Amino acid sequence: MLVTGGSAGIGAALAEGFAARGAVVGICGRREDKLAEVLARLQAHSPESRSWRVDLADLDGIEAFAAQANEELGGVDVLVNNAGIPKRRTVQDLTPEVVESTMAINYYSPIRLTLALLPTLVERDGHIVNISSIAARLGPPGEAAYAATKAALTAWSESMAVDLRDTNVGVHVVNPAVIDTELFQMPDNDPAMIEDVEALPTDAMVEPVLRALDDGTFEVYVPEHFLAITQGKFNDPTAWIEGTKAYARSRD
């Protein structure tokens, strides 16, 4: 299996969870030192696991990386598209360039990797796990650029799951809420409005994803109660928007 953004956070936690169950796991990321630390933990359980330093923002290099990873892993049967960046700014402070660069990393990159590996995944009856976000469903304040990338990834996943109906490929979308990762401390971002939401540890992601792989669940929320919140939003989107405006004003 291949986990992008595997040098820290959710990607590292998922990779370690899979390796602990005996899977051969490949991880990729930009920080070689962090990759080495995670790989050492993976190889304690799964000695054939490996890592690659790669910048998935380089869209033109993704196809070559996919071929390399596929060959060196002996075939990818589970692809976890986890790599991504935050971009917390109000729309008044966004530029087209910032929006496009965020979309490139969070949307176009996983799409290119998926398409490159799709023949192998179909051949191996594999799984595609796209790490989206609760932001794709709830559109939090100051997250327009980021939320749009995740909403695009979720919509892609829905259509892809139907398009692959005559294969045995499983498609899964995971919507984490607030997970204790670097995402909320990265520079060049406005402060996140998360004071009222409990941050979960990264390993809280492992069991829900493993269950989805086992039972075929398409969409997973972590924590689960955000499913009910999302359903409430879709029952009355206008009320949700007005309530979110009031919440944002209280934090201004």
Segments from the language model and where they lie:
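Conserved glycine-rich cofactor-binding loop
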Residues: 5-8
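Substrate-binding pocket helix/loop in short-chain dehydrogenase/reductase
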Residues: 90-91, 95-100
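Residue(s) in the substrate-gating loop at a strand-loop-helix junction
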Residues: 133
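Conserved glycine-rich Rossmann-like NAD(P)H-binding loop of the short-chain dehydrogenase/reductase
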Residues: 21-38
